[in-house]
Amino acid sequence: IIKRVANRADIEVYNINKIKAQKSYEICRDIIAESNLDMHLINCEYTLDASKVIFMYTSDERVDFRDLLKKLASVFKCRIELRQVGPRDKAKIIGGIGNCGLPLCCNSFLGEFDGVSINMAKNQLLAINIDKISGVCGRLLCCLKYEDEAYKEVKKKFPKIGSFIRYEDKQCKVVGLNV
């Protein structure tokens, strides 16, 4: 929810909070290591009024962080939120370069993640090589979704693979498509 346009004072506070968040990140990371918790800290950010600090982390398993929460509350003296994020959110937060050589879509312009299925790769006649159709997050490439409808529409105009067509007065079998 956007309440208003940020003014100079808000921007100054935001920049101060970013510096504060970097220090808080390091402190939290150290406390996690000391506590031997199976979680990987990804990011830390403060609300504009610094009344709450949000720590984002990944973990393969459920983590009991009650003791961690107590330790963090005693250090930071504000509300603490521990937010577990998935692989796509992690990639969005950290950023990086995709297989295509461009900045990650999720980090540069995607607002929400749409469902992507292996059928989209099949529909686009891509080789089902998981390494080639997976993003840096380990999930199917988000861009498979962008072109899916276009491939569905254009494939309607072509004969199906395995069907027979007439070409230059000859019966020919369709063995492949290159869309």
Where would I find each of the regions flagged by the language model?
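Basic/aromatic-rich interaction segments and small domains that mediate binding to polyanionic partners
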Residues: 178-179
